Each structure stands twice: as C-alpha cells, then as structure tokens.
C-alpha cells in the first residue's frame, strides 16, 4: 500500500493507493478546494522542495475528483498503476494545468488507524 499526504495552503488530504479485491484502487479524501472537477496526476520525481513548482512534467493521469459545495472530495478510483513503481513520485491535484496542491507518495503499512482532519478558524479554534 502507498499513501500521499497533501498539505498545501488550506488544501489537505490523504490519498491511498491499495489493492482491493484484486484490483488497485485510489482512495481518500481532500478538503479545502472550491467545488468543481480536479485532476489527480502522478509526476516522475518527488521533488517538492519548492512546493508544486518544483515537480516535473505529468507522467500518469490517475483520474478526476469531484469537490462538493462544502469543499470536500471523496476519492474512489480504479487504476492500472503498479503501486510499487510510484513510491517516491509526486502526486498533484490540478485544474486547468495549474498545480494547486501536491505531495510525495510513500510506503504505508496497513493498520487500523483513522485519520481525522482538523480545521482551524481565524480565531485558532
């Protein structure tokens, strides 16, 4: 299993790449985007030293995600990507060829942990 943590400005999410019933799936959620359609794209290298500006050209289009009016996208996509070949590569969330958020895909162990998103308002609460 592989995982990518997205944390860029107000955009946050967790994207998992995992086998489910013999097929590879892309699962997760993202918050903080405006409603609409966005693309999930894997890039050849995982250099995010200058944020999303430092990742190279797109390599693999994973699919589109749909953000609801509350700014939440629930991700459940089929993929033909071999999970072992994407470790260390960058994943971006893009719209109209603009990279809005990104992260590096890493190895994840299967466990029973649940990740909760915490949003903080302008008062720090």
Swiss-Prot record:
GO terms for cellular component: host cell cytoplasm. The keyword Disulfide bond applies. Disulfide bonds join 52-102. It comes from the Viruses. GO terms for biological process: superoxide metabolic process. Keywords: Disulfide bond, Host cytoplasm. It is found in: Host cytoplasm. GO terms for molecular function: metal ion binding. InterPro entries: SOD-like_Cu/Zn_dom_sf (IPR036423). Virion protein with no enzymatic activity. Belongs to the Cu-Zn superoxide dismutase family. This is Cu-Zn superoxide dismutase-like protein. It comes from Ectromelia virus (strain Moscow).
């Amino acid at each position: 299993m592989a995982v990518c943590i997205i944390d860029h400005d107000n955009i946050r999410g967790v994207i998992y790449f995992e086998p489910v019933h013999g097929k590879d799936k892309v699962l997760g959620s993202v918050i903080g985007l405006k409603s609409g359609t966005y693309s999930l794209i894997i890039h050849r290298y995982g250099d995010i030293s200058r944020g999303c500006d430092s990742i190279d050209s797109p390599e693999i289009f994973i699919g589109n995600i749909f953000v609801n009016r509350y700014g939440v996208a629930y991700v459940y996509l089929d993929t033909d990507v071999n999970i072992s070949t994407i470790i260390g590569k960058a994943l971006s969330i893009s719209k109209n060829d603009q990279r809005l958020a990104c992260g590096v895909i890493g190895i994840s162990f299967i466990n029973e942990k649940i990740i909760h998103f915490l949003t903080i308002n302008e008062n720090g609460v």
